[in-house]
């Protein structure tokens, strides 16, 4: 398996051990935990996490827990910043195919890196991004 990019919901479901996460997605996260691959977290996922906390849709301390996981440094989870190259990739993703801006940024990150996306968003293959789900 190659490295991958994660969508926000997949990351949340993995860290919460939520059964909504597919077996294939769970296996990729477990490979990351074993140090076999890297999973990139687009920084917009952090924005979505704060938003979901504010809406009380996830634990109010989820972002702090994620920060602790990332700070330890023994994980294959790596933040990937929103760069001008990601913005250029975003411009190539049709708004009609992926109308939600955070989803477009996540898709653009995967496209820029040339990696599959861990997501259940079935619109992504329409723009040429392979899914792991």
Q: Over which residues does each language-model region extend?
A:
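Alpha-helix capping/helix-boundary segments
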Residues: 10, 45, 86, 106, ...
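Alpha-helix N-cap/helix-start capping motif
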Residues: 19, 43, 84, 121-122
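Active-site neighborhoods of divalent-metal-dependent phosphate/nucleic-acid chemistry enzymes
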Residues: 74-120
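Active-site regions of enzymes building and remodeling cell-envelope glycoconjugates
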Residues: 128-133
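Short, well-structured N-terminal submotif of metal-dependent ribonuclease cores
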Residues: 1-41, 57-68, 113
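Short aromatic/basic micro-patch
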Residues: 5, 40-43, 81, 118
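Phosphate/NTP-binding elements of NTP-utilizing enzymes
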Residues: 49
């Amino acid at each position: 398996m190659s490295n991958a990019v994660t969508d926000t919901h997949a990351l949340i479901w993995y860290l919460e051990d939520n059964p909504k996460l597919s077996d294939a997605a769970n296996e990729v996260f477990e490979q990351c935990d074993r140090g076999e691959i890297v999973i990139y977290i687009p920084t917009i996922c952090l924005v979505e996490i704060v938003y979901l906390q504010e809406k009380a849709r996830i634990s109010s301390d989820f972002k702090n827990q994620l920060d602790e996981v990332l700070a330890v440094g023994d994980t294959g989870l790596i933040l990937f910043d929103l760069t001008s190259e990601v913005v250029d990739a975003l411009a190539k993703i049709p708004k009609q195919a992926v109308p939600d801006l955070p989803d477009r940024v996540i898709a653009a990150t995967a496209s820029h890196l040339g990696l599959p996306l861990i997501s259940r968003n079935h619109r992504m293959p329409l723009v040429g991004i392979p899914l792991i789900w």
